Amino acid sequence: MAKEEKEEIRYISITEARARKLDKFKMEGKIPSTNWAVKMGAAIGILTGRTGTARYKTGGRGHGVDIEAVDPQGLFRILVGKDIAQYARGGLDILIDELEKGKSVFDVYRKYSEGRTE
């Protein structure tokens, strides 16, 4: 009898380039924390259906956040399962792009929670 293993996601890996940009936004006071930004990225990724790709160059030190800090109740994982990290990276790319355009996190939240994508 084959024993079925339940694979748990414990860590959402983000690239060094994303981590540097998030640190810059945190220092400027645009975001409260990296964990918050990844949580917002996961929500945006799920709402838009966008998954992360190797958009930024990978390599160097690993950067990321603990999954429990992003999704303590497991709601995102219930919605998308093991793909939570890919949705988080996709949404994080959207969030970073919007912040680089000078938008506030409130504008970004309002735009994507209302379902607008333009």
Description of each model-found segment:
Residues L47-D83:
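Short, positively charged interaction helices/loops
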Residues A69-T117:
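Intrinsically disordered, low-complexity, charge-dense segments enriched in Lys/Arg
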Residues A2-I9, T15-W36, M40, T58-V65, ...:
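Surface-exposed, Lys/Arg-rich phosphate-binding patches that contact polyanionic backbones
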Residues P32-Y56, L99-S104:
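Short, basic amphipathic alpha-helical segments that act as recognition/interaction helices
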Residues R10, R18-R20, R50, R55, ...:
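Arginine residue identity/basic-tract feature
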